[in-house]
Design a protein with these regions (language model features):
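N-terminal secretory signal peptides that target proteins for export/translocation
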Residues: 1-4
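Sec-dependent N-terminal signal peptides
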Residues: 6-16
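Cell-envelope and extracellular/periplasmic
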Residues: 23-178
């Protein structure tokens, strides 16, 4: 009988929790990848409709989207207004395809949305188990069991990405108000 009461209470709390979450949904996009996701094209080549959002009209290095908030590769779970600004090989202000995607999502949604992104160029999908260096996107359980996140000095991009998602949920997404 006590077990049944506890089970009913758990189900009630779960239903109330899910109802609260469902009544206040937010849009969250999760993006991960390698060089093509991390930015390889100079901001000078942005489409004109995105350049129009720039506050720096010489190199298009600064600006902000109205609704898109992003947490990218920082391991802190903190969102900032999105602007294409990847840095590669001494070149600043590079962009990837997602800059266009987020722009059109803004036009469609017309409300704040969040992006959790972990994208690193020069990485590999399949780990070389004998490599002492490198950063890898792998979900192989035997490899993950011995790997550490790149954000902690290891070589697993997936574990870093998972940490970033957790931090974003804990610091921001779970605390949003309607």
């Amino acid at each position: 009988m006590i077990l049944m009461k506890n089970l009913i209470l758990i189900l009630i709390f779960a239903a109330v929790g899910f109802n609260t979450m469902a009544s206040n949904p937010v849009h969250v996009i999760i993006t991960a990848g390698q060089s093509n996701t991390d930015g390889r094209t100079p901001n000078e080549d942005l489409p004109a409709y995105i350049k129009a959002l720039a506050t720096d009209t010489l190199t298009y290095a600064e600006g902000a989207y109205r609704y898109c908030q992003i947490a990218q590769n920082d391991g802190k779970g903190e969102f900032i207004p999105f602007w294409p600004r990847a840095k590669r090989s001494g070149k600043n202000n590079m962009w990837a395809f997602d800059a266009v995607t987020y722009y059109w999502l803004e036009q469609l949604l017309q409300e704040k949305f969040y992006v959790v992104k972990w994208a690193v160029g020069g990485t590999s999908i399949a780990p070389d188990y004998n490599a002492s260096k490198g950063r890898f996107w792998s979900a192989a359980p035997e490899w993950l069991a011995q790997a550490k996140p790149t954000s902690d000095g290891g070589n697993s991009l997936l574990l870093s990405f998972i940490q970033e998602i957790d931090m974003c949920i804990d610091k921001t997404l779970s605390r949003l108000k309607a």
